[in-house]
Amino acid sequence: RPVGIQIFGANLDSMLKAVDIVEKTNPDIIDINFGCPVKKVVSKGAGAGILKDLDLMESLTKAIVKRTKLPVTVKTRLGWDENTIKIVEVAERLQDVGCKAISIHGRTRAQMYKGEADWTYIEKVKNNPRMEIPVFANGDINTPERALKIKNLGLDGAMIGRASIGNPWFFNEVKHFLKTKTHLKP
């Protein structure tokens, strides 16, 4: 523990049904994925597709927060594309409707996984005087040194994704490095 279960969608009724089902499994957290860039998900307006409709993102989050007693967190991206980066506003709106933490992938949906994640926007969210909830970085945290950089930026933590695929011991490597500044021996 803690155990979090992630849900995604763009339809209020479906999302609320998902919350009801998830609650029966007794998790500690419900996380909403507003960051998945996969075409199959986005084409339904879900995942990062919701970044085209911030009012819907806000209203879904508000309804889910109201529906459950569990803490609700959100994972999202900087924006739909480079012309719609509104992550500071998004974070404020999510916090205002009861979101308890936000994880931000440092790319837009248009970037998918190309280029390098831009953590400066995530740092802007964290340094926003209005922000009171934890802010986590996601994207390109693929070495222990990069995890340390997240810590040194003053962010509340890192959400590691692709770096752990096929490398589940990566979490231990990061934890050890953050504690000792040395790498685990192979």
Which stretches of residues belong to each language-model region?
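Flavin-dependent oxidoreductase catalytic cores
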Residues: 1-186
